[in-house]
Amino acid sequence: MKKVLADKESLIEALKLALSTEYNVKRNFTQSVEIILTFKGIDMKKGDLKLREIVPLPKQPSKAKRVLVVPSFEQLEYAKKASPNVVITREELQKLQGQKRPVKKLARQNEWFLINQESMALAGRILGPALGPRGKFPTPLPNTADISEYINRFKRSVLVKTKDQPQVQVFIGTEDMKPEDLAENAIAVLNAIENKAKVETNLRNIYVKTTMGKAVKVKRA
């Protein structure tokens, strides 16, 4: 494992602290747990660091990501059986043309938008204007995909993406999960970006924290 990646033991140690009462005050909701990577010597305006990786988490968080699916006619029944949060047929998608309010609601409520290839252009026209400002996008649903496996994978997937600051902040689970499971999810995120340009040479620090809690710095070799 490369030196920029924190080992599992260091992650577990930091996560235990982040979940402790010293760093995390209990709220009346289940808080998310995030990993934060900060970078040095990066000019985001010049595009020095560009990350956009979809990462399936090995341990399913209790808060599954919401998935909207636009399947082909042949995929429709399989898609319904896989229990995504929303299933929309191509015909129903067409009827949303010009319907800004319901389209914005779908964009706001769902995280992933799996679109069969035959409907990608249509989805881009209808959903795109609402998805773009939210940093979301249609993802192709191949004709040959195992629908159930594909949908379930995205229910536990996160997007690792840089914005306008030299850092990335990624959901890795919820505070009711074991530190060991959260650490596995954190490692999946780190492994997905370790070979990207500027990550190894410009990584400053790694932190973990709950939604409302204090950040805990992860020890690195």
UniProtKB/Swiss-Prot annotation:
Keywords: Repressor, Ribonucleoprotein, Ribosomal protein, RNA-binding, rRNA-binding, Translation regulation, tRNA-binding
Gene Ontology biological process terms from the UniProt entry: regulation of translation; translation
Disulfide bonds: none
PROSITE patterns per record: RIBOSOMAL_L1
Function recorded in the entry: Probably involved in E site tRNA release. Binds directly to 23S rRNA.
Full protein name: Large ribosomal subunit protein uL1
Keyword Transferase in record: no
InterPro entries linked to this entry: Ribosomal_uL1, Ribosomal_uL1-like, Ribosomal_uL1/biogenesis, Ribosomal_uL1_3-a/b-sand, Ribosomal_uL1_arc, Ribosomal_uL1_CS
Recorded family membership: Belongs to the universal ribosomal protein uL1 family.
Gene Ontology MF, one: structural constituent of ribosome
GO cellular component, one term: large ribosomal subunit
Name of the gene: rpl1
